[in-house]
Amino acid sequence: MIVICQPDHEIVDKAVEFSVIMNKTDFYFIFIPGETYEIINFLTGPGLGNRFTVNSFSIDLIPIDNDLISMEREGSFKQLYVDNDITPISDFVDSFIKLELCFGKIKHKYIKGERAKVFCDLLSKKEIETNIKTTEEIFGMIVFDRNVDFLTPMTSNFTYEGLFDEHFGIKWGNVYIEKSYFKIGVKEREKNQKDFYSLTSESNPFHSIIRCMHYLDVNNYMNQLRNYYIEIAQKSKDVTNLTDIQEAISSYKDYLTNYKNPIEISARFINKFIDENHKEDNKNYRVKESIFLSGVFPDNLKLFYDDYITDKKDLIKLLNLFIIETLTQGGVKDYNLLKRDILNIYGYQNIFLFRDLETIGLLKEKAVLKKLTETSYQQIVSKLNLISTDIDYKKTKVKDCSYIYQGYCPIILRLIELAVQGKWNKFKDIITKLPGESIFPEDETEIVKPKSDEQKVHTIFVVFVGGVSYNEIEGIRFINRNLKSIYDKSKDKSVGRIQLIIVTNEILNRKKIFNRLGKEFNQAFAFKKFYEDIEKEEGGKGKEKK
């Protein structure tokens, strides 16, 4: 029997259970895009060692959209940060080198984080082995280790596509949604059926316009669009000549083809989210989150936690707020007491989830400080100007990233802005406070003023080792929209513009992160077979040994 699957705990458990029950020994696993050490150790462990043949089918970087390339290597986050397995980095480099074989060696590099440095070191070795020549086809790249900013994937989504991904799970630029979610009067037999929607810029022009907007702004835009087409429809009633009739028909056809269905879907989704967002529990949660992000400790937090645990509300949401407190305050106050209460009420099966989150460094007890000092996070917020209190959502041309994140600019997005402006050296003292090594060009003016005189697009790869969230993808798209032409004062002319393209080994969100942590293989069938083998070998004496 051949099983072709992703390296997923549940799939492997079911396959092992089936093979042991059916007593099948000719069992083949083909993992896409590759196996993990954890799975290999399990399948070759006690009782299972000779039952399975394991192989993998490698997948290279895949263009998800015109500005997004991903390996879609699910599980790489856990491998890198829980298992300390750098196989995903090695696979990522093997795929990335193929891009350089096509476009040439990338000269200018900004690197932040330990795993980002490992990626670039392995890439440099591959470049020497393959003798790739340096070109300016890809002008530069900014490489981040995911742990430079664990905070952003854990914060609430406010961009349209970020919300869409969190609710439905975008895969390969597409999404499947149950018919009953958007459509009224769906027949009973069709309620569980799903409709397919493509969200790429080519297949869904309307979605490509609204995806990096703040969700409140999407409502305004849809109303403007509706009014525009209503106005066209009214004018078409008085049309008399053939040319005007053709224009009216063309506009209506454009509306039916590109806008009618997406507008209806977006309107219903946004209205559902606004209703959900206005619930008292969600309001309180977001208030606490926003206070943490500003670097301040919220009032009555212990009471909020106690009530939340007592009422046995959503555990993932609670742990998410713990993580935000850990990353902004240096730890959770009374963490061990809260952890004990959670395990008592929610169940001790969650101890594995706590273990993994603690291993990564996302949960820990806050140290008791004798003297109150400004935390590293507070310094970062202040120096990088991450909080904006004067956001006006009625303005149509807001250029600061904090606009689409309810007043908070994610750390990584600010670092990207500084890189394309050639200002990492200016802010190096505060950048070094972030996890991992910082490496950037000695002469940053080459980034701001390319030597080429041609009017061209200067492409910069933004590389995420360990995954990127749609929360951040939409922020980078927002930066892309606001990047001005590169102007050289000495020559008094524009020398092109910068275009950012995102490259990663996995697209993730906070739900996916939690779903992949705290998972253990079901050892029951493995040990059952192990003891059966002992009994056969020793003529039934295995029971006494057991």
What residue spans do the PLM features occupy?
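Extended, well-folded catalytic/binding cores that form a central cleft or groove in large enzyme
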Residues: 1-546
